[in-house]
Amino acid sequence: MSLSRRQFLAVGSAAAAAGLTGCGSRSSLGGKNELSMWTWVGSVNDDLIGQAEKAIPGHDGMKLSMTRIGSNYKTKVLTALAGKSLVPDIVAINDDVATYFPNADQFHDLNELGAKDLSKDFLAWKWKLGITPDDKMMAYPMDTGPTALFYRTDIFQKAGIDIDPAAVADLAPDWDTYIALAKKVKQAVPGSSITDNITSIFSYRMAQAPKRYMTEDGQYIGDQDHVREAFDLAVRVVKEGLSANAQNGSTDADAVVTNGRLVAFNAAVWWAQLGPKNAAPKTKGLWRVTAAPGGAGNRGGSFLAITKYCKNPEAAFAFISWLESSKNQAQAFLDPVLFPSTPASYTDPRLSAPDPFFGGQKIVDVFAESAKKYPGAYFSPYDSIVGTPLSNELVNVETAGKSPDQAWSDAQRQIGRELTRVGAI
């Protein structure tokens, strides 16, 4: 099951031609002295945007006009590109950046605007994710989502476990030792869980892997051992009684944090805010963070791209490179808690301060190590086509008692049908 680089580009060009033809003339949003930008809530620092709305740094004759799109963000971006009219100059793109690669001809190659000279300032794996199969720099790095192990010190103490972050990391360097540790915690504090649901274990294990579902030359590898290992690990955690069975989107999702059932969680840096700080503020001081079992990982992170309809590409690049400088990424970590893709930010005093919610621990140090050690992995335009059936079948295992082997087989059959339908295999 393979698709060559040349075939991929041919398919991408055909998709772009078929999906992005429109009767409108090419035009971008906003006045001639404005750069229009689309993004979503919580993706940028408001103070920095406020500065650019007065004047683009280095381009005093230009200013930013930003729109926060609510629901269906990606659909609205693709619809605007398809119409080739009233297209924003700059768009934010989520971690599914590879799904935009077939439409790369609708975006500027940022290397032609000077991006290549700045690559040394960024995490190499993050930089690579914005590069298309034909080596065009389509998307500029924003934040990342390095992973680590969150845990409740009060619960671990009841199980007689040394709560020092370094000690916990030594006790659970891999998933086998971590599960053994979790069983000890559950024995001391019945009802304790180390995941909200089965799919989180699968997703975060895959987030540690150096390869995912497709190779760069288009070969399907989502049925290989590394994926099955993550699948089986998720099943094992459930079978050991260590999942809270709080499915995504359910009312129980936050409740397991609030009521204290979720006593440890291998998660991305952004979970600190979405999880304990929001759902369990009374647990302030009880949480710590340490290196995750199984190694460094990453889940999440965004990008900025400049559309071909941009009225002033040079000013647009000056803006995005300023916005995502190490100094400004450090500011964006404070609000809205976006973890930088620029390693120089990690030693910024604004990031390295102790966090009272985590008992005064400097948690940025833990996530910085994860971000730097993460091996990186290739994300294909078809990752969601592969990942969704696998996750759905895992839910069937946890909620309906489906046989794991049958769930795996059914997922692979559906994946094969869907990849065939879209011409990927």
Which stretches of residues belong to each language-model region?
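Short helix-initiation/N-cap motifs at beta->coil->alpha
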Residues: 67-76, 96, 171-177, 245-259
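Paired acidic/hydrophobic, glycine-rich loop segments that form the ligand-binding mouth/hinge
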Residues: 89-92, 263-268
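Hinge/lid segment of periplasmic solute-binding proteins
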Residues: 95-148, 286-288, 356, 369
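Glycine-centered hinge/linker elements that transmit conformational signals in sensory
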Residues: 179-183, 217-247
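Periplasmic-binding protein-like
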Residues: 284-305
